[in-house]
């Protein structure tokens, strides 16, 4: 059995070795062929699990998708319920609280606006006062040299007037002397 030309090899039994080459089927009888075919089917059913695994995989995927769909439907239903509850109960409460708070915030805002308006008025008045003081100081700064110049001109005019008066007095005195000389003749 262990000779080199025996159908038995170290890889398996002679029956399995005879199954591997399909061209040996023609040399065997028809009953043997049917037996080998049945054994091949039994072998594929017992040892080849691919169709079973594929079927189980399809079944698992189908069940998973159904359960997932149901779970998602439950999640969506819960979400719809919570949204409708929020719309019916929480939203009106929030709206009422917001309206109440909005009124107080509006009053505070109006008060702050009025206060800021008063501060702006004060600031404007202060700026006008500062501008007025600056204008007054500038006017005084121009006024003092103007008054000094006017005083200088007045003195000059007074001096010229005094000199003119003195000339006229001298002239009248000389005229009177001449007149008195002429009258005495």
Swiss-Prot record:
Residues 1-16 have a biased composition (Polar residues). It comes from Xenopus tropicalis (Western clawed frog). The gene is bloc1s5. Belongs to the BLOC1S5 family. InterPro entries: Bloc1s5 (IPR017243). Keywords: Coiled coil. Residues 1-24 are annotated as: Disordered. It holds the Pfam family Muted. This is Biogenesis of lysosome-related organelles complex 1 subunit 5. One of its GO terms (cellular component) is BLOC-1 complex.
């Amino acid at each position: 059995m262990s000779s080199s030309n025996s159908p038995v090899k170290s890889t398996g039994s002679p029956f399995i070795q005879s199954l591997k080459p399909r061209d040996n089927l023609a040399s065997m009888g028809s009953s043997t062929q049917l037996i080998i075919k049945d054994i091949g089917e039994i072998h594929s059913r017992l040892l080849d699990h691919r169709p079973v695994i594929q079927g189980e995989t399809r079944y698992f995927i189908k069940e998973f998708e159904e359960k997932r769909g149901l779970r998602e439907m439950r999640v969506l239903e819960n979400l719809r319920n919570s949204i409708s509850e929020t719309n019916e109960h929480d939203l009106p409460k929030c709206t009422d609280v917001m309206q109440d708070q909005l009124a107080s915030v509006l009053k505070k805002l109006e008060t702050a606006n009025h206060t800021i308006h008063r501060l702006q008025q004060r600031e404007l008045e202060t700026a006008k006062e500062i501008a007025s003081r600056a204008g007054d100081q500038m006017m005084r700064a121009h006024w003092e040299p103007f008054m000094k110049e006017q005083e200088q001109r007045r003195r000059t005019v007074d001096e010229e007037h005094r000199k003119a008066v003195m000339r006229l007095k001298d002239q009248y005195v000389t005229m009177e002397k001449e007149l008195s000389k002429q009258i005495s003749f």
